[in-house]
Amino acid sequence: METNLLPGGPSYGLLDESGVQMETTVCRPVLSPTHINGTASETFTVLQQKMRIVEEQTSSLRDDLIMLGYGDRRGQLETPNYLEDPASQKAISPIPNEVICPESPGNLWRNYEFLVNRMCYLENLIQSLKMNIFHLQTEKESNPQKTAFLNDQLNIIQGEHSKGLKLLQLEVMNLRQQLKVVKEEEDRAQDEMQRLTATLEIATETKKNAAVIEEELKTTKRKMNLKIQELRRQLAQEKLVRESLETSASSMLLKVQEMGSVVEAERQQVHALQEKCTALHSSMKTTQDLLAQEQRKNEDLGMTISQLKSDLNSRDNLICKLVEENKATQISLKKEHEENIYLKSEILSLQDVSGKAQVLNDQLSKKCSELTSMLQVVKMENSRIIAEHQAILKVEQKMITETFQEQNLLLDAAHASITGELQAVQNEKAQLQIHLDHLILEHNQCLQKSQEAEKRTVVQKELLESTIARLQGELKASLQEKKSLLEKNEWFQREVNKTEKEVAKEKCNLEKELAESKEDINVLNQNLQTLMEENKHLTNKMASLEHHKATSDYQGKVEKALEKITDSKNMLAYEKGKLQTKVKQLEAQLHTFAETMLQKDHLHKLNKALEVKYTQANSELSASKAYLEQTEAHLKEMKSILGKNEEELAQAVKCRDAALKESQKLKGDLKALEDRESKKVGNFQKQLAEAKEDNCKVTIMLENVLASHSKMQGALEKVQIELGRRDSEIAGLKKERSLNQQRVQKLEAEVDQWQARMLIVEAQHGSEIEPLQKSLDITREDNRKLAMSLEQALQTNGHLQSKLDHLQEKLESKERERQSLEAFKEQVAEESKVEAELHAERIEALRKQFQTERETAKKASQREVSELKKALDEANFRSVEVSRANRELRHKATELEKVVNSNKEKLKNQRAQIKLHLSAKANNAQNMERMKQIEMELRQMEIIKDQYQKKNYEQSLSIQRFVSEMNTLQKEMELLTKSQYETSARNKQQELRLVAERKMRLELENRCKELEETIRHLKRCKEATENKLKEASVESEQITANLEEAHRWFKCRFDGLQLELTKNRLQRLPREDRWLEENQDMMHNVATSQSVLHRWETKQKYHSDTERKK
């Protein structure tokens, strides 16, 4: 509540904080402020209010320290009950109406200014202490290693402090001298006040008016006390809210720490899994090398078979088609291999970035630990400082109460002798009223400025609240992202386990296929040997058949046998082509298997990168939480400081209004207050030196924070550049993948199904979120199970490695044999090529010979038939020739029987060969069944490959999501930097406003000095008027004496004249002329005396007018 006395009317206004003017009418006329001066009780109440405000601020500091963690020392920090409870305090008895002393107003104004400056200085010191405590906390948290530099600065500041103390001591000496002068003036004033006791009746009326004003002030005080109680209740509510927020923040921090420990344990497990996976990869590489060697052997065997059966032109087209298909598959495999290489390069770059982020996170964690230790030290120091400050305040309160009691006694004695100068001061009313009007205008301007400042603070508060809400929303979003990352991590772990199981199964299947392929190779070698024997046997048969071309029947049989042989060769070539295609398919499958292994490695690396990114995201979340907490604390402190500034402005206005009344009553307090202030100045200067050091520390810490922030921004820019490159590369990959749209269309349907399942799972997970501890226990049990399974896998790997070592030894021996066989095969292949060419030429020649022999045999048979007819005709005539012919025929018959027996043996041999051929066909059928099984397994492998490609596609989608999340995090970081810049700008604006307020304060001080000078001038004028009044009183005494003498003379003359009149009544006629002449002389004397009095009055008026003009 602010009071504003309205001059020149019968009413005065009370201005409330809301600006509403409450007018109360008074029956008496309004007195000027010179007549209504504040008593010692009013000064005591104002000072008591200020001390209560200081106590409330100290209690708020105590509560802040208790909130920071000094709950055990609560008993040391609590203030006594008589300071906190206004009801327990003794009521101040009203002081009786007293006469106001206007003596020595210049000294009273000086004392008033000194006390007001002192109280403002104390309030500014309290604010600076609060800011220094905050700066100490932040400084000690950030820069614990710069004590030497700060000690040097301390020494410099202590030197400056000693110089300042010397200057202050000189100023104190000057002030003491001034006090001596003031005391002398007070003694003089007391001597003069003893003369002016006649005007006490006039002072009683002023006392009554002062009593009425005191009652109104008491009502305003009661209202202010009610408002203070409401504010205290609000502060208690805010404290409870702060405690709840701090408990929630501490619980969140504990949860984050637990999550960090779990993540570290999972990292260790992942590292173990990676090592095991590398061991498995090495073993798989060895098996792949063995498979490649066996494939090479198979290829060599196929080459031998193809060289042996190169005669068959019918299968060349099929082989060309198969070669084209193989080329197409190789091109597709090359493309996929290039994609895998590109993805590997991306993973390596992401691993580098994650490594850098881990280093930065480690640095931030170290800084956080150092800051926590510094916070604890600062809390201890703050508790100690507050205890000392409370003790000093208690001592000061006691001293102030004693001094006020003394002042009350002195003022009670002085009020009896103060009322004499009221008549002399009435001439000075007009000038003082003009000054009061000017001061009222300035007061209204100050109120307008304070209202504008309040509006600005309200706008700033709203902006800060909006930023806090936005930061809370970002925190919630980051927590949701954290949950999603945890779910993705679990999903990746499951996929890794599945892939490991699938790899183990594939390894077993491949080992089985290797054994079966070895058996097939042995069977094929046997078949080759049988075919070589058959070829040799056929060549022998061809040689024997060339000797026996005589008869056509045997030639037909031989041709049938040759046709059967050619058919069997064609069948063998067809089976050879099938085997070659199957071998190529197996090679392609092995290549795909190798690529799947590479993709598995790629997935492991992606899993590592995602885990690193997860840890990085956790660290960034923790850093953002810490930064948010710091900003919230800073905002709260800024709010409290703004509220206190507002309260201090209102209190300063009240103090100014009250100080106008109390300026003439504060002379006796200066000595004791100066002694105490000298002590306080020393303590506060020490605190200022410490505060300066703390400010330097805070500046250094802010520079370090800005440097680290700039580094983080550079790292983020690099990551963004890399992500841009990767995005361009991904776009190129997408263009390449457009060629495989048929597969993608199939996979998209499955992806939609999986996404639907994932949405269902996410909904279930969102509806069934349990506490983090249960999930952590489950993850620990899963990790133990994984460790057991990994141990088992390591054991199995050990066994498999031992077996692989044996196999490698066997394979080395086989490789040696193979090398020898390859050399031998090359020779055999060359010989077989030559022999095949010779056989082909011989077969063609034999065919031509058979055709020519058939024609010649037909012609010969026809000729023989004609000759036989001729012979039969001649047989009758030539019996002797017939008998000779019979003998020759018998001889030929015996030879033919021999030929038939030999042909029978040949037929038996051919039947045996046919049986072998049938057995070979049965083996080929078995091989076909095995090849069908292999084809089924290959189809299964293709299905697995498709699934793996689906997983890769899902992982690519997850990577894209992660990249988008990283972009969002970068945007959030940019927003945070913008908010920091805005807060810094606001702080700068507030600093500028504080500078402006300081300038206003200096201007007010200058105006107060000017007013003091005017008061001094008025005092001088008053002294001059008093001297003139003394002179006038002396002159008036002289004039009164002269008038008395003239009056006596007139009386004597009048008496004489009356006597003469009585004597001369008898002699009227002759003596009338003489009497008239004497009467004229008397009237002339009276006129001269009246003219002298009129001149003296005009002179007095002229002197008074000149003095007023001065």
Curated annotation (Swiss-Prot):
Keyword Zinc-finger listed: no
UniProt key word Iron-sulfur: no
Disulfide bonds: none
Keywords: Coiled coil
InterPro entries: CCDC150
Coiled-coil annotated residue ranges, if any: 122-250, 288-313, 413-695, 728-1048
Protein known as: Coiled-coil domain-containing protein 150
Species for this entry: Mus musculus
Gene from which the chain derives: Ccdc150
